[in-house]
């Protein structure tokens, strides 16, 4: 990766890790702080979950965060990223162990992609996608 991408990852990954752990503990606000408030923005999730526009995305994440609790493990595994000018993306897997919908010891691996844009000197997520990783889908009775 080049210096522009390295600088992007240095700025984004630590803050993103903390925000995702908070999300898995039922608090969507740190995650939302990383997202843009400017249109267009969207989220596309598994099973047809789609949110378009800032208000819809925020409502969706606040609702989903309430389904998580007790994050005993969370790891973001970066697969690929790139940054040029005011645009960037990241692709990876989010590995989670904790409670989901009241089920303790839930293990999840989600494949996630995020598209970022620089706004007022900070990277903000403009679009995201997440679904159950293909190998986890085959081995899970809940997927």
Task: List the predicted regions and their residue ranges.
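A beta-strand edge to alpha-helix "cap/lid" segment located at domain peripheries
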Residues: 1-36, 41-143
């Amino acid at each position: 990766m080049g210096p522009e991408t390295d600088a992007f990852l240095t700025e984004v990954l630590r803050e993103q890790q903390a925000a995702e752990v908070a999300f898995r503990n039922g608090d969507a606000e740190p995650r939302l702080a990383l997202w843009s408030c400017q249109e267009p923005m969207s989220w596309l999730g598994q099973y047809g979950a789609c949110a378009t526009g800032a208000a819809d995305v925020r409502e969706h994440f606040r609702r989903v965060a309430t389904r998580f609790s007790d994050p005993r493990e969370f790891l973001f595994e970066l697969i690929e990223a790139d940054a040029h000018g005011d645009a960037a993306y990241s692709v990876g897997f989010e590995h989670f162990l904790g409670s989901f919908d009241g089920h303790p010891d839930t293990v999840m691996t989600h494949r996630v992609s995020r598209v970022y844009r620089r706004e007022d000197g900070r990277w903000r997520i403009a679009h995201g996608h997440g679904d159950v990783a293909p190998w986890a889908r085959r081995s899970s009775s809940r997927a």
